[in-house]
Amino acid sequence: MINYMSMINPKKILLHCCCAPCAASILEWLKENQYEVILYFYNPNIYPEQEYIIRKNELLRYANELGLIVVDDDYKHDEWLQYIAGLEQEKERGGRCLQCFKMRLLATARVAERMQIPVIATTLASSRWKSLTQIEEAGKWAVAQVTGVEFWAKNWRKDGLQERRRILLAENKFYNQVYCGCEFSMNRLD
């Protein structure tokens, strides 16, 4: 795996965030390592819309406490359903998840390109329920569609970040969801 951080050493990173619990320890680590972080909330997969609003508001609350900027994209669940059409019955970590990651990370890469931010990463890589291989594949594919943006395929589960995530979740009293987000993942945590 190429370590893009050693190649370009950016001061700015656009971090795609799925939720506050997954973002907290990552944001702490990035701040400790002197990165300037802008958050991007684009998660059209989350269902129902009320769940989407809860997760978004938790992230906005936490970002506000940290003084961070959040680029908040529109909720486009119908577009997401079209994007994953035909993959509804896939298991978690299957083809539907890969397509979902591609959609969200492509949107992230496009925002980074417009904002001239050289690197994107995602909090999806902190979840033990998600495939790091799929996330990396989707991230690399997404940045190949734009110019001047690289994908940082960091494993946010290592170096004590999983344990720190649990601590920050409790300290901040975050809402902690029990499924990834889409209606197809609600009862399929296999």
Where are these regions (language model features)?
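Nucleotide-activated chemistry modules centered on ATP-dependent adenylation/adenylyltransferase
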Residues: 2-190
